[in-house]
Amino acid sequence: MPMQITAMDKSSYKDAAAIMAQCLSHPWSEKVLFQELSNPNAHSYVAFENGEAAGFLSVWEVCGEVSINNIAVVEKFRRRGIAKALMEHMFTELCDAVSANLEVRRSNDAAAALYRSLGFKRVGERKDFYSRPTEDAILMTKYLNGEK
């Protein structure tokens, strides 16, 4: 069965929590993810590969601006285009948005390369933004309906 991307719902928020727990140094709890289901500004997606939860993307959209909160792909599913597919799915779903913003660890070259390939541009940085370990964040933005 090919990759399937679905909106996170009551049947998949625990899958999203498991992905985050495996991949992120500060994962959201199941409770927080469940609360996201009732947030009208929250849009979360889960990617399944052969029926197995493989990736997760969480964004908030407010006044046409998308803030990418978390993206994670389980290690055994990495380098298969899942993160890119999640991002492209989100762009399609939120087609009326004007821009998308994210932070990426300075050392995360693979993620930064993915974001650049999707049209994100570096717009700044935040000193010591991340902990475990302490690291700067690179700020990136993509204008969704034409370059500004």
Give the positions of each predicted feature.
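Acetyl-CoA-dependent GNAT
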Residues: A7-K76, M87-H89, E93, Y143-E147
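Conserved beta-strand edge residues that scaffold enzyme active sites
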Residues: F34, N108, F129-Y130
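A generic structural signal for short beta-strands and their flanking turns/coil linkers
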Residues: G64, N69, V98-A100, D136
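Extreme N-terminal starter segment of soluble prokaryotic enzymes
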Residues: P2-I5
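Conserved GNAT acetyl-CoA-binding A-motif
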Residues: E93-V104
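Conserved catalytic-core motifs of GNAT/GCN5-like acyltransferases
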Residues: N101-E103, R116, K121-I138
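Conserved glycine-rich acetyl-CoA-binding loop
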Residues: N70, V74-E88, R105-A113, S117-L118
